[in-house]
Amino acid sequence: VRRQRQMCIRDRWVFAGSGRPQGKVNEATIVKNMDPEEREYLLYLSLYDGVTSLAIGVDSLSTLDQPTVDLPVREKPVVFYGTSILQGGCASRPGMAHTNILERWLNRECINLGFSGNALLDLEIAELIATVDASMFVLDFLPNATVEQMKERAEKFYSIVRSKHPDTPILFVEDPIFT
């Protein structure tokens, strides 16, 4: 599986290109020969490989600045908790992880707390999630948590989040295996 970086251009958030890593150190031209005008970009980094350093090069007459508006809107994000599927383990490229797609569609920050093989309803994670002033919480742990873990922890996990967010929607995602 090749890990990719992906860039999208704001307006309609169209796909602009991918860089395909070939080793530990990589250099890639993702966008070139564009008309000189102001644009905003989203840059998605690899879903699994870590990044220790990142440099973005631009034409000598160009500049990089902070976005002019808060896009996506960071106030009251949607918080997702779940498995490697949620993390983006099955996505063809980083921008195609469903949380990234939803972030673009909703124009709302989506916090992706997908943990490969580790959505085990750890109560410490519930405490962490509960610190976020979210517009919605999406809990998708069924593929990882055992029946015993669900019996022991699901209600407590929910209660921790609900106690700090009595009016915020909490969506439980069902595992397709059990439908």
Please name every model-derived segment.
Residues 1, 20-23, 58-59, 116-118, ...:
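A short linear-motif detector with a strong N-terminal bias
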Residues 1-9:
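Single conserved hydrophobic/aromatic residue that forms the stacking wall/gate
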Residues 5, 38, 132-134:
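Short, well-ordered alpha-helix to beta-strand connector turns
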Residues 10, 16, 51-55:
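A broad structural signal for short, well-ordered beta-strand segments within beta-sheet-rich domains
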Residues 15-36:
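Beta-sandwich interaction modules
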Residues 34, 41-115, 123-130:
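Serine-esterase "nucleophile elbow" of acetyl-processing enzymes
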Residues 118-179:
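Alpha-helical cap/lid subdomain in secreted, periplasmic
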